């Protein structure tokens, strides 16, 4: 049976396909080779190592255009798996470096990409704003 799916706990950066991250890193000449295993998947040993890999993978996302591309890549992959609705956690700690003006630009880029995905692939994205708890309350 092929039922439509919903995704209720998706972190946009965490859902970044490894091939997308490798490609963007290559374009920007950023070395992130240590975050992948021999098969090209993300490699981590425990939760704290996972957080470091997550941050390293996210480090290639530096502009609103990068987040638009990421949004399209994640939603295309989700739609191909039968997802029709996704609730996505978004953090100003990653998108825009805690700058409210930049945050708006990133959200605008994400929203435009999500609207394009909805028109093309029939998948709806809604955002949930969240802090990054391991950064601590001071940030």
Would you name each region that the model predicts?
Residues 1-139:
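Metal-cofactor-binding active-site regions of metalloenzymes
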């Amino acid at each position: 049976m092929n039922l439509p799916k919903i995704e209720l706990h998706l972190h946009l950066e965490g859902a970044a396909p490894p091939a997308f991250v490798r490609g963007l890193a290559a374009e920007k000449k950023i070395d992130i080779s240590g975050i992948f295993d021999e098969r090209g998947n993300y490699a981590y040993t425990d939760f704290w190592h996972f957080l470091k890999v997550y941050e390293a993978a996210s480090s290639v996302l530096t502009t609103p255009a990068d987040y638009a591309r990421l949004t399209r890549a994640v939603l295309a992959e989700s739609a191909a798996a039968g997802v029709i609705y996704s609730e996505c956690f978004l953090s100003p700690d990653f998108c825009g470096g805690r700058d409210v003006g930049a945050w708006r630009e990133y959200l605008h880029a994400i929203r435009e990409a999500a609207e394009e995905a909805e028109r093309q692939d029939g998948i709806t994205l809604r955002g949930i704003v969240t802090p990054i708890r391991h950064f601590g309350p001071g940030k």
